[in-house]
Regions:
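Short, well-ordered alpha-helix to beta-strand connector turns
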Residues: 16, 28-29, 54, 68-69, ...
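N-terminal leader/targeting and accessory segments in enzymes
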Residues: 1-83, 87, 272, 276-278, ...
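Short internal beta-strands
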Residues: 55-61, 225-229, 355-356, 379-387
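Phosphate-binding loop of NTP-binding sites
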Residues: 81-224, 228, 234-242, 288, ...
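ATP-dependent carboxylate-amine ligase
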Residues: 1-13, 26-31, 37, 41, ...
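Short, active-site-adjacent cap segments at secondary-structure transitions
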Residues: 64-65, 133-135, 176-178, 231-235, ...
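A short, gly/pro- and small-residue-rich
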Residues: 42-54, 72-79, 188-194, 211-214, ...
Length: 468
């Protein structure tokens, strides 16, 4: 058996066009990676890969007797996976620049804004997205997971390289970092959009979640952009002063708004950004910072910012009933809900109704906190189902309302009934009153008892608005 170093050296000497761990996806001159410990199974799929054009098989069981020089055997393949991926992904580095965006909230919006900014320069960029409505747009790829596994990522990267794209924009989730899905990738630029409590069902505690997010960044990174409106962003900056900072609160940042100017290291821009909420501005500044890092300049006309579009289901406005408004937003964390409600309170003079729930089989620690925020920041609340999945909706709601001491809320489990009731209440309120329907945003389904039921908040509200 060759050593790991010898295997990697041999791998570098072979002209490989791609790699996969699924024999169905093998193309000519691919490397096929077999993690199977079952010799018969490993041989079956490896032979299938060779028949389809694989040039080399990297396997956890020794197949040299059957595959001869087309087999690289490593009995410790699972533990050495990152080393092989680093070698295989290195071929992509020369052809495309990868931009990774992480954060508790704001990843999708930041990536979407950056994709549009790059289009101003007619730069060929792929946006990897798990928002179906966005995946229908030009130069996008749909992924069901925020951050897909290494092999699917390579598939998307190879496709982008074949299409001669120069940039690959992707969101990096804490699950993706922790599970090694981005192992081997060499990021040209990275961004932290925000950081607050979430996913403690998976990470178990806030410290673990924080450490995973922080591990995405290195003190040797040259192209980091972080929001310093959170403690993690400040810490990343303190440990790597080459990091560029953005803020909507602190003018010490490299990118911020001052009066009607966008201040950047590459010069000032007149502020034509069309969205006024602080969290949208913060996401945009992260995207603008990434653009500046890519080109070392901001070279488009500021007025072009007027053309920027927002993601569907992100603070999406529906005008109703004589100057009364409904917003649909994806806010499903305490920090996101607080940010949206602060924005609405600052903009509108009337009452605010907040309609929301919390996902089942997910971080339960945030439920009570979201209930308290909704009650503190709005005048009336309607608690309903989000995606209960297989968890008891009554248990979820009980955890949401446990610290809601004022009795200015209703519990309506059926989301359609809840939205209908919210619209009826809104109609009776004074002008400039708002109904916020939070939690699901763009989603086209609701998960109840393990089944996906077709449902979209925006569609349902538009169906009701003329009959309520």
């Amino acid at each position: 058996m060759l050593s790991l170093t010898e295997n990697l050296s041999k791998l570098e000497s072979i002209k490989i066009t791609g790699f996969t761990d699924n024999s169905n996806f093998v193309e000519r001159d691919y490397a096929f990676i077999s993690f199977s410990k079952n010799p018969k199974e490993a041989l079956k799929y490896s032979k299938d890969a060779i028949d389809k054009g694989a040039i080399i098989v990297i396997s956890q069981v020794n197949l040299h007797e059957y595959l001869k020089d087309k087999n690289l055997f490593d009995s410790n393949l699972v533990n050495h996976k990152d080393k092989y991926l680093e070698t295989l992904f290195a071929r992509s580095k020369k052809s495309i620049k990868i931009v990774g965006i992480t954060g508790t909230n704001g990843k999708s919006s930041t990536a979407f804004f950056l994709h549009q900014l790059l289009s101003f320069k007619d730069s060929k960029a792929t946006l990897l997205t798990n928002t179906p409505e966005v995946s229908n747009l030009k130069n996008t790829q749909f992924t069901p997971l925020t951050t897909p596994d290494n092999f699917l990522l390579h598939h998307f990267l190879k496709k982008s390289i074949d299409l001669k794209r120069k940039y690959f924009l992707m969101e990096v989730s804490s699950h993706g970092i922790d599970q090694g899905r981005i192992s081997g990738l060499d990021f040209f630029a990275k961004s932290l959009t925000s950081f607050s409590k979430d996913h403690l069902d998976y990470h178990k505690n806030f410290s673990s979640y924080r450490n995973v997010k922080k591990s995405f960044f290195s003190t040797s990174d040259e192209n980091n952009i972080v929001s310093i409106d959170n403690d993690l962003g400040k810490e990343i900056y303190s440990e790597n002063k080459s990091t560029l900072t953005v803020s909507v609160n602190d003018k010490v940042a490299n990118l911020y708004l001052e009066n009607n100017l966008i201040k950047t290291p590459w010069g000032d821009l007149t502020n034509f950004f069309p969205f006024k909420s602080k969290f949208m501005i913060s996401n945009f500044l992260c995207a603008l910072g990434l653009y500046g890092k890519i080109f070392n300049e901001i070279d488009f006309e500021a007025e072009m910012l007027k053309n920027l579009k927002n993601l569907p289901g992100r603070l999406q406005k529906i005008s109703l009933f004589q100057d009364k408004i409904c917003y649909v937003d994806y806010a499903h964390t305490p920090d996101a809900l607080k940010s949206v409600l602060d924005y609405l309170r600052g903009r509108y003079k009337g009452k605010i109704i907040t309609l929301f729930g919390c996902g089942g089989e997910r971080d339960s620690s945030k439920r009570g906190e979201m209930g308290k925020i909704a009650q503190e920041k709005s005048d009336f609340q309607i608690i309903t189902n989000d995606n209960p999945r297989n968890e008891d909706p009554k248990k979820i709601v009980a955890q949401i309302v446990k610290d809601m001491h004022l009795k200015n809320f209703d519990i309506i489990f059926d989301r359609k009934e809840a939205i209908s009731e919210g619209l009826k209440k809104l109609k009776k309120l004074e002008q400039e009153s708002v109904l916020l329907v939070a939690g699901k945003g763009h989603e086209n389904f609701q998960i109840l008892k393990g089944k996906e039921i077709e449902f979209n908040d925006l569609t349902f509200i538009n169906e009701l608005k003329d009959v309520i």
